[in-house]
């Protein structure tokens, strides 16, 4: 299994505000779709509820401690240990609590860095480049629908870190 994080955060590591993305960036949504289609997404219940439905053409797995949680098209797990039992390419999709729990266990991270500062109430955990090697860094294209400067980073964990 390959275990990755996929996330977008601003310069202050904001990832959300009131259970929504604080920005609208279609390029990032397209990037996420390209990377995750055909693979597995693991997300917390609050993240799933903010999306409202399973993302198509992916296995959607929701981690929750609520025994009553059920949703068509979603597999439910109740512990972090169950993530290790998944196969294929598994993307940790959020939110904050799941990122905090998994950042030290993932092989790599796909991060869209939003070049701005947004109001937020959820954050991506701190990370340093001494633990991560930049595999790629691509500036996002700006146009009438994508007006916020952004960079797509792929970071790979350094050996022994």
UniProtKB/Swiss-Prot annotation:
Mutagenesis / variant outcome for changing residue 99 to Y: Trimethoprim resistance
InterPro entries for this protein: DHFR, DHFR-like_dom_sf, DHFR_CS, DHFR_dom
Name listed for the protein in its UniProt record: Dihydrofolate reductase
UniProt keyword annotation of NADP present: yes
GO biological process, one term: dihydrofolate metabolic process
Keyword Oxidoreductase (UniProt): yes
Further comment: Trimethoprim sensitive.
Gene Ontology terms: cellular component: cytosol
């Amino acid at each position: 299994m390959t275990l990755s994080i996929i996330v977008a955060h601003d310069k202050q590591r904001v990832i959300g505000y009131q259970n929504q993305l604080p920005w609208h960036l279609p390029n990032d949504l397209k990037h996420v779709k390209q990377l995750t289609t055909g693979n597995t997404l693991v997300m917390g219940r609050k993240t799933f509820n903010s999306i409202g439905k399973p993302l198509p053409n992916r296995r959607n797995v929701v981690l929750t401690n609520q025994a009553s949680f059920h949703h068509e098209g979603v597999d439910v797990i109740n512990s972090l240990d169950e993530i290790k039992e998944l196969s294929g390419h598994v993307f940790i999709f959020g939110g904050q609590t799941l990122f905090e729990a998994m950042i030290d266990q993932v092989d790599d991270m796909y991060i869209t860095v939003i070049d701005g500062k947004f109001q937020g109430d959820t954050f991506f955990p701190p990370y340093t480049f001494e633990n991560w090697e930049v595999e790629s860094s691509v500036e996002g294209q700006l146009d009438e629908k994508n007006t916020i400067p952004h960079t797509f980073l792929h970071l790979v964990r350094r050996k022994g870190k």
